[in-house]
Amino acid sequence: MDLILEGSQLALQIHESVGHAIELDRILGWEAAYAGTSHLDLTKLNQHKYGSELMNIVADATLPGALATFKYDDEGTPAQRVDIVKEGIWTGVLSGRDSAAVAGVKPGGMVRADGFGRLPMVRMTNVGLLPGTSSLDEIIQSTEDGVYMETNRSWSIDDLRLNFQFGCEVGWLVKNGKIIDMVKNPTYTGITPQFWGNMDMLAGEEEWVFWGTPNCGKGQPSQVGHTGHPASPARFKETRVGVRG
């Protein structure tokens, strides 16, 4: 069944299945608290297929008005925009000075602490999915058999950021291009690269919204950080969904 996600749910999908997985300290195995490590392998950088050609992810700490925008990170590195996924291919990571030196990449200016007495660590900035050219109406109208889901209710993902299940507050059955009924407690499951590889429609700039979270936890002792996740609605083909009428 085809799955259509509205922007706020897609923002959490980005956070959990992309954002934490591309933190370089997790990729290197230095950090595992709360979110585990990562399925990504640095030897596959610029080769690994993360998703379909519609998938363009950037980490941009310079984005005006977004939740994780700043001038300099807590190591004094200027804020910047880094390409993370380009046309479906994994091209970048979230890094600081130490992790970048080990990996042989340019420091990304992505190290922050939630207070002066805390150790700075790699954190997501504004990790967003660049908009496409469709609209939500067009996506629904072109869907023969699917579910449109809105507003997160629950999430679960393994410690490699691969296998996941998400639940939403409300879902709408879509048949032959029309919404025909509401469904309760809709859920969907997937495996990260296959899920993103099935993205075949993506709404444009008019529906691109600066979503995010003010309370992303990481580290031991725990620290809380702001993360931004700009996104617009998208469709994912052949997704395993569960609904209750």
Regions found by a protein language model. Give the residues of each.
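N-terminal small-residue-enriched
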Residues: M1-G245
